[in-house]
């Protein structure tokens, strides 16, 4: 399975010069708050997305006394390659795969898939539909190659439709050509999503069967395409929504409004589950997604788990550890206390482990 065999980081946030050789399986990263633990995970995510999972303001990633940061890694596995990303203060971004300029950030994501679980992932339960679309579209993007083009074209068509809706004099006949295109693209997008989300839901249910609290809670995932499913076709619903769309100035129906409803005993899961149970559900969602990805693509994503020991009891951490081990994934886990991190994160059979200490931006191997 693909894994980072070497990681070099320069002038990134508060990190000093980093040059480490991670374990292909489990990597425990510990240090005080503010020491740079999360920054190390953030640097790895930049290699996968050409952007941070913590901020959209790239200048915050560059050390004050420098003009650019650089992150470089050697990735080993069935398809070995080298990847590097540099971002300058001016905004110029350079990304390379095996010395050649990457065509896009999507190419980086395809070559180095990464799953991130941190405090922000609670948005899957607490937030709006946008967070859940981002979650399941990660899988759709990687598995269904036609999705990316269909989605990009769909977004362009909806933007054009929204622009027309804001005109003072507009009749539905002016929108019909755009709605025909939107309907065709929506059908492709929906088909891609259904083919990915259906096995995702099945995998999630199987995983939750291993969590004791789930015996007393009826957890349900339900995909919603972004329009009402029933007798009326999506194009007809677009036409009927014209008056409301015109009043609002934007399109209220379509794949850009799709969702994955997560309920417990018929109510929103966030209203029923404890914080620890919510974290367990979120973990299961990410593992289920990785399982489907592995089944379809034959690889596993790298997992970045920030402050994982918090809000999870030893039993749930043991379950998560087993799930990750069964996947064969490379994992980076951060925590404050080394002993606690090592004690609550059980070592699986035949699993190599490395511990890294981060202190004032310096990353060293811990014996």
UniProtKB/Swiss-Prot annotation:
It comes from Saccharophagus degradans (strain 2-40 / ATCC 43961 / DSM 17024). GO terms for cellular component: cytoplasm. The keyword Metal-binding does not apply. Belongs to the RecF family. It comes from the Bacteria. It is found in: Cytoplasm. GO terms for biological process: DNA replication; DNA synthesis involved in DNA repair; double-strand break repair; SOS response. GO terms for molecular function: ATP binding; single-stranded DNA binding. Coiled coil: none annotated. This is DNA replication and repair protein RecF. The keyword NADP does not apply. ATP binds at residues 31-38.
